[in-house]
Amino acid sequence: MNRAVAPASIAPPAANYSHAIASAGAELLLHTSGVVPTAPDGSVPDGLVAQVETVWTNLIAILEEAGMVVADVVSITTYVVAGEDLGVVMAGRDRVMAGHRPASTLVVVPALARPQWRVEISLVAAR
């Protein structure tokens, strides 16, 4: 059975999609959409460090809403607008993962869907 995961503690999706779908069966699988740096009030913080922190806050809220924790994350895909920002993005990921090492893909892109977004992250978690 699949169910949409939509924590009330984060901003709603920016378009017609779910933040995440939790799939239950022999195991629990969670596939998130690309999560962007939008705060619950709809604002986007200035600065890459704050944007990375907001994305991870949103991702952790999604994990918790699905009954999962960071240790359940099996794959991360990160999109970043500027190659020189990779160190900041990786440091944010490493801080949140706290030694947990899921598969990870980091892609430098020319732009994201909204010009103020500098980072977008999706993940897969399984338990």
Regions found by a protein language model. Name each.
Residues M1-R127:
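Short, polar/acidic, helix-capping and beta-turn segments at strand->helix junctions
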